[in-house]
Each structure stands twice: as C-alpha cells, then as structure tokens.
Amino acid sequence: MKIYRSTLLHTPASPFAVPDALQTFSDGALAVGDTGTIAHLGTFTEVLAEVRAACPDAEVHDLRGGVLLPGFIDTHVHYPQVRVLGGLGMALLEWLDRNTLPEEARLADAAYARTIAGEFLHGLASHGTTTALVFGSHFAGAMDEFFAEAAARGLRVVAGQVVSDRLLRPELHTTPERAYAEGKALIERWHGQGRSLYAVTPRFSLSASEGILDACAALLTEFPDVRFTSHINENNQEIEVVRGLFPGARDYLDTYERAGLVTPRSVFAHNVHPNERELGVLAAQRCSVAHCPCSNSALGSGLFPLRRHLAAGVHVALGTDVGGGTGFSLLKEGLQAYFMQQLLGEEGAALSPAHLLYLATLAGAQALGLDGQVGDFTPGKQFDAVWLRPRAGSTLATVLAHAESEERTLAALFALGTGDDVERVWVGGGVVFAREAEA
C-alpha cells in the first residue's frame, strides 16, 4: 500500500448538476493498493491512521509543494498529426489539404508510424493526459504500431483505424469491404487487451460514403462494446459540402443517424454549428460531444454553443484536436473553453474552475463509458493522476503560494499552468511520465 500526500482536487460529480461538486483537501492523501486501485481518500491524518492500522509499513510519498489532480482525459486527438501542429492561417478544409493529409499518407510506412506513435504518446503523457479517444491512421499497420506503443507505455487509449473512400488523397481511400475486414481484425487483436479499447472511426461524412458508414455500423453491431467517433458540424463550408453529398439527409447528424451510428457509444467532435433537431437527437441517444476550443479558434471554425448543448441535455467533454489545436494541454483547452464562453456573453455558459476540471477529467471518462474506473479519486477507481508542481520562482508558483482557497489554486492552474508544470503522471498506479527522468 502506498500513500500519496498532497493538495488534492477532484470533481466526483458534475458541477453542472451539483453546485458543490468540487472536493478539495489542502493536506490530503490517497492510499493506493498494489493493483493500482484507490483504497482511501481523505485528509492525510485520517488516511494515515486508517492505513497504518492495517498496514504499518505503508510507504508515504510526500507530494506537497504541488497539486494532485485526476489524470486528464482527451476525447478528441489525432495520432498522425503531431508533426503538423502550428499550421495557422487556414480554415479547416484548406488546412487538411495542405498540411494534414500529406503527413497522414506518410504513415503507410510502419517504421515512420512507430516513430510518430512514440512522439504522440509522449505528448499525451507529458501533459498529464492518462486516457485519450484517439483518431487513428488510415493504415491498419500504423494502428498496430500505435496500439503496441500505447501498451508499452501504459496509457489508456480508445482508438481506431480511420476510414474514408472519397475526397481525400487516393492513398488514404479504402473500400467498404476492406474497411470492415481491417476493422474487424484490429478489434480482434487489440480491443480489451490491457488498457486498449477500439473505436470505429469514419473520418467524417464528407469523406465517407454510405457504404463506408454501413460498414462501420456492421462493426458496431458485431462488437457491441466498441466505441464510435467521428466529426460533425465543425465548419460551415464542410457542412455545405456534406449537405450536397447527402441530399436526402435532414442535416449532418442524419448522415450518421440513418446508418445506425448515433448511440450512447458515440462521441462526435466539434458540433460548433448544430441545429435544434441534432441537439435533441444527441441528447435522446445519450451521445457525447468533444469540445475542442483551441482548434475551433485556430481554424476560425466558430464559438461553441455550450449553453445550448447543456440546455438540450447533451453531454460535453474536452478534446485538444492535435494537430488542428495548439498542443496536448487540457489545461490550455479548459482556459480557452472559458474564454470562448465569456466571448459569447449572455449566450455563453458561466464556467467556474470546477467546471473546467470536470470537463478535463470525469466528463471525458463518462463520454467513454469509463467513469466506473477513472475520472476522479473515488475509492475503488484506478489511480490515474497528474502531479502539477510549478518551478520555483515562476509566476504560477507565486500565485499558488498566495492562493486564498483551493478553488483559487485550481483557477491559477488553468490560467497559468503548462506542460512544464507536469511533474509526474500515473496510470493504474504506475508512473508513465516523470519530469526528472526527462532531464
């Protein structure tokens, strides 16, 4: 048994539903068993007494001087795009054509894909992300490299081969038959192995014909516990193209709905420009939306209508959208989400630091159906955590030293925190990133 002593902050419930959902311990502790399961949570004095009564030799890890949060959960991030981060000055479709698709084509080479997988997974872990819903590669071999590397590093990943059959580069296209066959083989090799799960992943309706969408639906039917993810309503130009490709569809969501792809296992990225029917269906079907505020801002896609999603009952979590976004940091995404709602004025949703933490942690676990395992520090869940410790003399260290409350501490972490403040990261009780090991 190990005891971790630190300032502890987590949201075991949604602040959108429970106003006092933020739970804080200024001198708190977690006791973690040998299997990585949290056994006790409370003040350090309480936890030490409980654990030492049964386990006198339990070791104490003193993490004071920093803040311990649940591991971040990224619900939309692209594995092949780590090297195209920073492509500013373009809207979505031009950015895809000029920056992204040429790079994605390079992952046909397995050795190159292996290198990219390592860079990508290091980017996640080094920014405190312990679980991610990952848009994969168009190549099955590249997905084998990805899952193998994720297993070696110990991260939790939900990922799948991306499938398309039109309007991209020809080498990225597949057929419905091949999409089904390769997807099935990948599911049988990787789904449920260790910490890996599979997500059926058509790129978006713009590049996926009805045949591709039907093949995806066949996989969801055959494997009832795999997940589904795709893009929706990101950019007005994209929406118009999809409307022309599916003249019989009521709207963008209907292109997926008609194929049977709108279910509680579905996570749709962006949804910046939904209509009321789409919001109603997403809520009724208990789908989730991955809100990617940095990407939406960088690509000029629009301001996310969070208040409308919440009013309709649609579940929302955060995604970084590497490489359309601006990096792997969910602290940055939380801050940008806050800015975006501020800019919307009366049409925006009022967000507190507790909301930002929830969106970056438990909300993602709920979107992925993993909230029984991760997302907060409730005893019985896995110890997935990030220890943030600012450098001595930094502005963040100064602010934290004078913070009047734990909520003020949390606000400062989102406002000022960066990847450089991530000191150590655990998944299932094991260290997956340590800053000192990078020195």
UniProtKB/Swiss-Prot annotation:
Q: What is its EC number?
A: 3.5.4.3
The answer to whether UniProt assigns keyword RNA-binding to this entry is: no
InterPro entries linked to this entry:
Amidohydro-rel, Guanine_deaminase, Metal-dep_hydrolase_composite, Metal_Hydrolase, Metallo-dep_hydrolases
* Any one of the GO CC terms: cytosol
**First-level EC class:** hydrolase
**What family is this?**
Belongs to the metallo-dependent hydrolases superfamily. ATZ/TRZ family.
Q: What is this protein called?
A: Probable guanine deaminase
Native organism is Deinococcus radiodurans (strain ATCC 13939 / DSM 20539 / JCM 16871 / CCUG 27074 / LMG 4051 / NBRC 15346 / NCIMB 9279 / VKM B-1422 / R1)
- Gene this chain is encoded by: guaD
